[in-house]
Swiss-Prot record:
The chain crosses the membrane at residues 17-37, 124-144, 177-197, 254-274, 296-316, 343-363, 373-393. This is Cyclic AMP receptor-like protein D. Receptor for cAMP. The keyword Disulfide bond applies. Belongs to the G-protein coupled receptor 5 family. It comes from Dictyostelium discoideum. The lineage of its organism: Eukaryota, Amoebozoa, Evosea, Eumycetozoa, Dictyostelia. Residues 1-16, 145-176, 275-295, 364-372 are extracellular. Residues 38-123, 198-253, 317-342, 394-470 are cytoplasmic. Disulfide bonds join C172-C287.
Length: 470
């Protein structure tokens, strides 16, 4: 979508093939990301269903055996504390009416609906992958038509032939709009991921703090009314929280859809209106976008999204550093750390893909002769088309695994050169777990959070029930 015409026909062909190569890889990466998320979500749903059935069986067994009087329910189907573990004496009355099975079933159903209706990070990544997929498909189609079907590429539609020159509609001008729409949508969805994760970090800290205070107050109440008060308050709170969160999540979801799809579509339409045909008498006619319109409708939203995503990522990192000192849950710390690592990778991807394009645009924008560098144009066009495949690699944490692999390889090489064979063997056993890049470190591997190398980020739904200590 360059606004200059200083490059030759051969130069534009080279740039076009670079974009086609990068877009082809991005199609593979975008489809792979969507498939992996869908598979992981199915596995998570089956796992949660099994856990709910097991919890329901335990509740029914406790009710039938009469031993449920020693169980204090703290959260819906997720955490239970024994009165013996809390050093609280059981109620002095001989027996009481336990919680009916129907209430347990109702709570399980509410939790299931609540989890399904939560706005999840994996859902945001799917939309980001769809936007990358559309951008790649449009990029390949437009570039191939420009190179091999140029007569149809610049052919003006009959309905617009009698209009002004800048308003001529062709495949070329429409292509500028749809490519711009898709790429702008990727900017907005990347920003949406960082904003949503930051909001979840804040809300999870607040909810956990309130839940802990309420649990302590409820446990310190009169032992005779302790269980009834907790059950009644939690049932009422679960219903109210479900209704409120359901409404708020629907509003948030619709807002994100509007911002990340509708607004980019409007901006893409502006790019179409700002496109014009140039070099009609050359061997490879093409169309360009007015530099001012391109700045306002494309690069200005890009700059805003880059700055905002960086800002929210820094806030999340700062928030995590503060919460880490006060949090005693190692599993929660590991989960939050993985979320931040992948968010940083997504930020790095969008910076790597679009900073060269920004540099190229502003060089031509402020130069008098619309100066362009062929090598910079090829790099920027190729890398920006690779956003989908780079997001896919970030989703798999390939970069971190490669770094760990080469670090361990260096340690292994140093250990082999050491004269102390015992220390060498110990270091090798500590540094390697399976000896390949598709495995985690051998030290302190959390089976619950590191079961599968390929499916990590899709588990970071960060629902309130998931972030509590189990």
């Amino acid at each position: 979508m360059s606004s200059c015409s200083s490059l030759s026909m051969d130069d534009r062909v080279k740039i076009g093939y670079g974009s086609i190569a990068g877009a082809s890889l991005s199609i593979i990466g975008s489809i792979g990301t969507i498939i992996l998320i869908k598979i992981r979500n199915k596995k998570q749903e089956k796992k949660l269903l099994i856990q709910r059935k097991q919890q329901l069986s335990i509740n029914n067994l406790n009710i039938n055996s009469g031993s449920s009087s020693n169980i204090i329910t703290i959260s819906n189907s997720t955490t239970s504390l024994s009165s013996n573990n809390l050093n609280i004496q059981p109620p002095s009355f001989p027996s009481y009416s336990p919680l009916p099975t129907s209430i347990s079933l109702s709570n399980n159903n509410n939790n299931n609906k609540n989890n399904n209706q939560k706005t999840k990070v994996s859902h945001f990544i799917i939309n980001l992958s769809i936007a990358n997929l559309l951008a790649s498909i449009f990029m390949i189609t437009i570039k191939l038509m420009m190179i091999h079907f140029n007569d149809k590429f610049i052919k003006v539609l009959p309905s617009t032939a009698n209009h002004s020159f800048n308003a001529l509609i062709s495949v070329c001008t429409i292509g500028n709009g749809v490519i711009g729409f898709s790429f702008i949508s990727t900017f907005f969805w990347t920003l949406a991921i960082s904003m949503y994760i930051y909001q979840q970090f804040l809300s999870s800290s607040t909810i956990n703090s309130n839940n802990n205070n309420n649990n302590i107050n409820n446990i310190n109440n009169n032992n005779n009314n302790n269980i009834n008060n907790i059950n009644n308050s939690k049932n009422n709170n679960s219903i109210n929280n479900f209704n409120n969160s359901n409404k708020s999540n629907k509003i948030i979801k619709m807002l994100f859809y509007f911002v990340c799809w509708v607004i980019p579509f409007v901006l893409g339409s502006i790019l179409v209106s700002g496109s014009r045909l140039i070099e009609l008498n050359s061997d490879l006619p093409w169309c360009s976008i007015d530099s001012n319109i391109q700045l306002i409708s494309f690069y200005f939203p890009l700059i805003i999204c880059l700055l905002a995503t960086t800002f929210f990522t820094i806030l999340i990192k700062y928030k995590f550093s503060n919460d880490k000192l006060a949090c005693s849950s190692s599993s929660l710390i590991n989960l939050q750390s993985k979320i931040i690592q992948r968010l940083i990778l997504f930020l790095i991807v969008i910076l790597v893909c679009w900073v060269p394009s920004l540099i190229s645009f502003f060089i031509s924008f402020f130069s008098k002769n619309c100066k362009q560098f062929l090598w910079l144009e090829i790099i920027s066009s190729t890398i920006q088309s690779c956003q989908g495949i780079l997001n896919f690699l970030s989703y798999l944490s390939i970069f971190k695994k490669l770094k760990l692999y080469f670090k361990n390889l260096k340690k292994k090489f140093n250990n082999n050169n050491s004269n102390n064979s015992n220390n060498s063997n110990n270091n090798n056993s500590n540094n390697f777990n399976g000896g390949g890049i598709f495995y985690s470190k051998g030290k302190k591997v959390n089976n619950q959070n590191s079961n599968n190398f390929y499916f990590t980020f899709s588990t970071f739904d960060f629902d309130n029930n998931q972030i509590q200590e189990k």
